[in-house]
Amino acid sequence: MELPSHKTKIIATIGPASKQKETIKKMIKAGMSVARINFSHGTLEEHAKTIETVRDVAEKLERRVAILGDLPGLKMRVGKIKGDSVTLRKGDKVVLTTRDIEGDETTIPVEFKDLPKLVSKGDTIYLSDGYIMLRVEEVRENEVECVVVNGGILFSHKGINIPKANLPIEAITPRDFEIIEFAIEHGVDAIGLSFVGSVYDVLKVKSFLEKKSADLFVIAKIERPDAVRNFDEILNAADGIMIARGDLGVEMPIEKLPIMQKQLIKKTNLAAKPVITATQMLVSMTTERIPKRAEVTDVANAILDGTDAVMLSEETAIGKYPVESVEMMAKIAKTTEEYRESLGYSRLRAWIDSLPKRSTIKEAITRSVIDALCAIDIKYILTPTRTGLTPRLISRFKPKQWILAFSSSERVCNNLAFSYGVYPFCMDENFNEKDIIMLVKGLGIVKEDDTVLLTEGRPIGKTVGTNTMRIFQIP
């Protein structure tokens, strides 16, 4: 078998433009590692069919594709629009109404009854991740009359942002918990928690999953100033982080976003947890076959910052070129990774070495792995794992070698789909080193006399963490 051309993981949102079996097949072949289901749109019946299609296609292609379910959260959204979209032009008057109607260019329904209580004359309201800007002219009992300051095309169920508004609702809603139950039932691998404000939002979901005896990977989406302020505690509780730049760039000064992204990626790397950079990465490809030069640079810089994964949203959900968007992301990743060595794990190693010396044996071993990679021409890193931690500890250094991870847990293997440079293999229970070598040789990944590095826990057969590193040539 042939490993992917790039190590950065690509998450693609499945929607009306990409839910067809043939399109999903092409996206997987192009490099999609994770299929994202956005539960803010569509019905659960539609999502169940999409999940089934992704699983079926991935199995036939013999590819491992994880499924991420993105929860709606507390986000205010516009309602249903006639024809699914409307063009709002600068200077137009438009009314936001809490009435349950179908919207048009003059009246837009909102799915939040308390909207009139949150705004006053002169306030700014943003729609569709800040692309459209409205100024409040008059507030009535169930309506807000506005003038369009920045126009654009508004689609059904797009988000509403009111900077500095205090939303009187929980971050994780009752509807979210219903969707989590659906996700458990349908074998979704990970859930994205929208509009997390504090560690308690993460812990509440973790507690719910524990009661359901479910071990879904919990990814906290950072899209509110509160989440940035409480980031360290959120990072400690979550399994992974998504930097959701659309809402974050509206809720805080946009000029602070680039540095904030770098800081959050660095912290998540240090914690050895996967970090996803999301929103508007190749957004021009929603309608154009070739992305903007600035978008290509944005993707490359996120990869150089240390992101594990990059995410496509409307580009693949509703765009004209879903397959081409994945292909472009893969091309950018491949080219950028070739230049990482001068900026990559040496910098992260310096950061880690500057931390207080509280390393575990496993962490010390993974640091030694990086030293060995710098000294010897090693082809692959082989990491048997029960929890996925050892591959992630190595992955944070972003080495140029593939990390081949082996686990008897299907869930662990799917969760590793979010980590940079990790290619997971699901093994039978009680597999050993001989089984690993037979597998990778049989697949044609390694050849006789290739030098590989193996991490393992000794004594073999005992439930112990990684405590040993060996370098040897494939017999």
UniProtKB/Swiss-Prot annotation:
Where in the chain is the site Transition state stabilizer?
K221
Q: Which GO terms describe its molecular function?
A: ATP binding; kinase activity; magnesium ion binding; potassium ion binding; pyruvate kinase activity
Q: What top-level class of enzyme does the UniProt entry assign?
A: transferase
Q: Which residues bind substrate?
A: R36, G246, D247, T279
Reaction it catalyzes: pyruvate + ATP = phosphoenolpyruvate + ADP + H(+)
One Pfam family, short name = PK
Q: What is this protein called?
A: Pyruvate kinase
What organism does the UniProt record list as the source? Thermococcus litoralis (strain ATCC 51850 / DSM 5473 / JCM 8560 / NS-C)
